[in-house]
UniProtKB/Swiss-Prot annotation:
Protein name in UniProt: Probable phosphatase VPA0505
GO CC terms: cytosol
Pfam family of the protein (one): PHP
Residues annotated for Zn(2+) 2 binding in this entry: 16, 41, 196
UniProt: Zn(2+) 1 binding residues: 8, 10, 74, 194
Native species: Vibrio parahaemolyticus serotype O3:K6 (strain RIMD 2210633)
GO molecular function: phosphatase activity; zinc ion binding
EC top class, as a word: hydrolase
NCBIfam families xrefs: PRK09248.1
Cofactor: Zn(2+)
Gene3D superfamilies with a match to the protein in the record: Metal-dependent hydrolases
Length: 248
């Protein structure tokens, strides 16, 4: 399986990552990617930038080192209402919004509370994809959430870092369940390295292996094609990006 988009990456702006966006873009080029989503942590994460950082991504060139740049964020799901930690004014500046649970921001609670938070963040319409759902600290009703994601065209991320066992330990078994059920329900999937250093860009081997294990069709894996990824953004109501006309 060929992956041409890395949908989850971090720069030094996140506070605990180690590469610049230029270093990430060069790594993406060298590894054969066509599109790179830059998705730094949103403000409530310790060490993360002010929301102006995300609004000001409009100054970024659409291509760096010949790789198309998608302006994004890894937002924090804040509460059971499904609120995220960016003002509404930021939405117009962002191509790709991940929503994730992080322990310093949303203290692990009950399965019912996690489920409510995920359903409400989906229904908010502000989020394109749910990040690293396999974290065992945040159990949720998988069927209810995945069916809600499908009906609202919100993608489910397969996070390679979660599968390595180095972060969010114990995620692998839950990721397996999520992919199996997601395939049955017919959700869209994305693949993210969750790179915090440029050498991790496009490191997606475990995510690919898991998707192939369950026979997920390529047309449900957004990151296998620039056209598929960008058409999904149109489906989500995002404006067409004219600089990427050749990728549609």
């Amino acid at each position: 399986m060929d992956i041409v988009v890395d949908s989850h990456t971090h720069t030094i702006a996140s506070g605990h990552a180690y590469s610049t966006i230029l270093e990430n873009a060069l790594a993406a080029k060298n590894k054969g990617l066509k599109l790179l989503c830059t998705t730094d942590h949103a403000p409530e994460m310790p060490g993360a930038p002010h929301y102006w950082h995300f609004n000001n991504q409009r100054i970024l060139p659409r291509f760096l080192h010949e790789v198309g740049i998608l302006r994004g964020v890894e937002a924090n799901t804040l509460n059971v209402k499904g609120e995220i930690d960016l003002p509404l004014s930021s939405d117009q500046h962002l191509d790709w919004v991940i929503a994730s649970f992080h322990e310093p921001v949303f203290r692990p609670a009950t399965e019912a509370e996690h489920t409510a938070a995920l359903i409400n963040v989906i229904k908010s319409g502000r989020v394109d994809v749910l990040g690293h759902l396999g974290n065992p600290n945040y159990p949720f009703d998988m069927e209810q959430v995945l069916r809600c994601a499908k009906s609202h065209n919100v993608a489910i991320e397969v996070n390679n870092t979660s599968l390595t066992g180095k972060s969010r330990k114990g995620s692998d078994a839950r990721c397996d369940q999520i992919v199996a059920l997601g395939k049955e329900i017919g959700v869209y999937f994305s693949t993210g390295s969750d790179a915090h250093f440029c050498e991790e860009i496009s490191k997606l081997d475990l995510a690919i292996e898991l998707l192939e294990k369950h026979g997920v069709e390529k047309d449900k894996i957004l990151t296998t094609s620039t056209r598929r990824f960008l058409k999904f953004l149109l489906l989500r109501g995002k404006p067409r990006i004219p600089e990427f006309d050749a990728f549609y």
